[in-house]
Amino acid sequence: MEMFTFLLTCVFLPFVRGHSLFTCEPITVPRCMKMAYNMTFFPNLMRHYDQSTAAVKMEPFLPLANLECSPNIETFLCKAFVPACTDQINVVPPCRKFCEKVYSDCKKLIDTFGMRWPEELECDRLQYCDETVPVTFDPHTQFLGPQKNTEQVQRDIGFWCPRHLKTSGGQGYKFLGIDQCAPPCPNMYFKSDELEFAKSFIGIVSIFCLCATLFTFLTFLIDVKRFRYPERPIIYYSVCYSIVSLMYFIGFLLGDRTACNKADEKLELGDTVVLGSQNKACTVLFMFLYFFTMAGTVWWVILTITWFLAAGRKWSCEAIEQKAVWFHAVAWGIPGFLTVMLLAMNKVEGDNISGVCFVGLYDLDASRYFVLLPLCLCVFVGLSLLLAGIISLNHVRQVIQHDGRNQEKLKKFMIRIGVFSGLYLVPLVTLLGCYVYEQVNRITWEITWVSDHCRQYHIPCPYQAKTETRPELALFMIKYLMTLIVGISAVFWVGSKKTCTEWAGFFKRNRKRDPISESRRVLQESCEFFLKHNSKVKHKKKHYKPSSHKLKVISKSMGTSTGATANHGTSAVAITNHDYLGQETLTEIQTSPETSVREVRADGASTPRSREQDCGEPASPAASSSRLCEEQADRKGRAGNGTDKISISESTRSEGRVTPKSDVTETGPMQSSSLQVPGSSEPGSLKGSTSLLVHSASGGRKEHGTGSHSDT
């Protein structure tokens, strides 16, 4: 059988890539082109019939050559896979002693990588040969250079990416300095039960923080005017952290489906962490999380700026509000620029603990320049402005130390600012401490992880791992807790009795009524009252005299009348805020246009015109409505033509009685008694006077025509 195989080889070998059975060919394998010989012969010991096949089969052993586990390993591999060929001796295989020396030097790495040593290269099968032959081992020393100590080479091995963590090219993956390599998923530091506990903890905290920040934002929506500058940035700050909490809650619901790549059994690839922006879902989570995290921090800095402008520079709320456009440009522009820069640099990384995607989880440089540095700058600037504002407020408190009430208010405000700032700064400074601690110890943790899994993954073990340290789960839980709890500090600012009252009114539907709507309601009720009452009066006219329902006005002068001449037009009747009866009565009867204006203003109405509209379009379609409005228009016309309103003196007050609102029945012109009170021509001259409506004790005089009437 062996003879038959040899004959077939002799027949078909010349047709395989131009190989000849008894001729040498130039070496084309790049790895072996630097050997002392430049001609080879095939088939080799492993029955490879061309150099391309031999080069492919030699690749699994190249890590031994790269690590230089033996100074002669590369020469041995080339002699085994690409044997030397000379004119005198067709094939020069590696010698047995040479094989034993190389194998003993590289045995540890062979076991580490889990390599399968070819049976054809077992040293027992090789022959002893004369090492003085020129084509053997001596010339090779000219190409290897100075030999290195095996133990010294082993210390410089470094990290080799395990086979199941390798990724396809073009994705930009890089793990522990090795390209096309990704971190394992689930997390490389913790066990499965620890990860489940951490995920549940993050989910609960995210829900709590989401509810707190939403409560702050909804409180703002209930009463927008309550939160003006300088405290308006608190609302935007709470909105940012509500989005951050929502992203962590979504990551809790998704688990590892977004932050990790699924295993590929065909390619023998395991679960790996997502690196880069190729995964759309992970990229979206990263954009929202990083953008609003940075924006929330910037809004806190803007809050300290507005406080400083108000306390230190004595800016008013309106002056600060004029700079709102610049505040928004900075608060949204800087995080947006950083987010776009990270996307362009392909620095998105999946977090297999929380389920979200962020930056700097495995790349220390990205964490240092895009997370740690911006947070440190914000803390420094915000704390400096905050201290400057508090010093200014303390100076103001010392100036007004004799004003006990204002000093107490200012003291409470300073305490409120201090507590709020502490609730924000303490978690943020703790978070910065976690990031700094992680920066210092990350390399040691990674070396320890490689040392723990090198035999399992068949990769070189790090000999420099003298002290093995592993991260504590509590450190990561504190980091996530401080990231989320920062947003809860906004609840302290809105937490007050006023907030409780607003929420109670919101749920009970007892909000404050609009003054304009309230005045319209009063006018509508007045018109409805006149409609009902006027119909009764018309019905009773058959039985009563016209003068029996006449009303008279008593004007009690407070000594403010300065006019010297009598007013032959309509006299102005002033209404004070304390005379509610006079306000309601005069509003209903509208004696003159001037009094109508005053009365409508006192009741919160806009103009007499709106009142005429309410009367012109009553809710009831009865015929009495039109008659009422006609009579009111007629009365105003007569008043404008010169009808005088006559007041009864203080001495006759005992002869009358105060008329309630329901007793007003007559819509005709007012009749006077025998006394006249001189009025001023200026409307403001009667300010402070009090008006009362009484029935005449002695009956009214007969009405005159529509012409002018003057009293003597």
Curated annotation (Swiss-Prot):
Occurrences of domain FZ (ranges): 19-132
List the GO terms this entry assigns under cellular component, sorted alphabetically. Answer: apical plasma membrane; cell surface; cytoplasmic vesicle membrane; endoplasmic reticulum membrane; plasma membrane
Cite the entry's keywords alphabetically.
Cell membrane, Cytoplasmic vesicle, Developmental protein, Disulfide bond, Endoplasmic reticulum, G-protein coupled receptor, Glycoprotein, Membrane, Neurogenesis, Receptor, Signal, Transducer, Transmembrane, Transmembrane helix, Ubl conjugation, Wnt signaling pathway
Annotated localization: Membrane; Cell membrane; Cell surface; Apical cell membrane
Q: Which residues lie on this side of the membrane: Cytoplasmic?
A: 223-233, 306-324, 392-416, 495-712
Task: Please note every region of biased composition (Polar residues).
Answer: 668-693
* Presence of keyword Chloroplast: no
Composition-biased stretches (Basic and acidic residues): 628-637, 652-664, 700-712
Q: Which GO terms describe its molecular function?
A: G protein-coupled receptor activity; Wnt receptor activity; Wnt-protein binding
The stretches that face the Extracellular side, renumbered to this chain, are 19-201, 255-284, 346-370, 438-473
Topology in the lipid bilayer is annotated as: Multi-pass membrane protein
Role according to the record: Receptor for Wnt proteins. Most of frizzled receptors are coupled to the beta-catenin canonical signaling pathway, which leads to the activation of disheveled proteins, inhibition of GSK-3 kinase, nuclear accumulation of beta-catenin and activation of Wnt target genes. A second signaling pathway involving PKC and calcium fluxes has been seen for some family members, but it is not yet clear if it represents a distinct pathway or if it can be integrated in the canonical pathway, as PKC seems to be required for Wnt-mediated inactivation of GSK-3 kinase.
Which PANTHER family has this protein been placed in?
FRIZZLED, FRIZZLED-6
Q: What remark about domains does the record contain?
A: Lys-Thr-X-X-X-Trp motif interacts with the PDZ domain of Dvl (Disheveled) family members and is involved in the activation of the Wnt/beta-catenin signaling pathway. The FZ domain is involved in binding with Wnt ligands.
Which family does the UniProt entry place this protein in?
A: Belongs to the G-protein coupled receptor Fz/Smo family.
According to the record's subunit comment, the protein's assembly and interactions are: Interacts with LMBR1L.
Q: What protein name does the entry list?
A: Frizzled-6
Originating species:
Canis lupus familiaris
Provide the taxonomic classification.
Answer: Eukaryota, Metazoa, Chordata, Craniata, Vertebrata
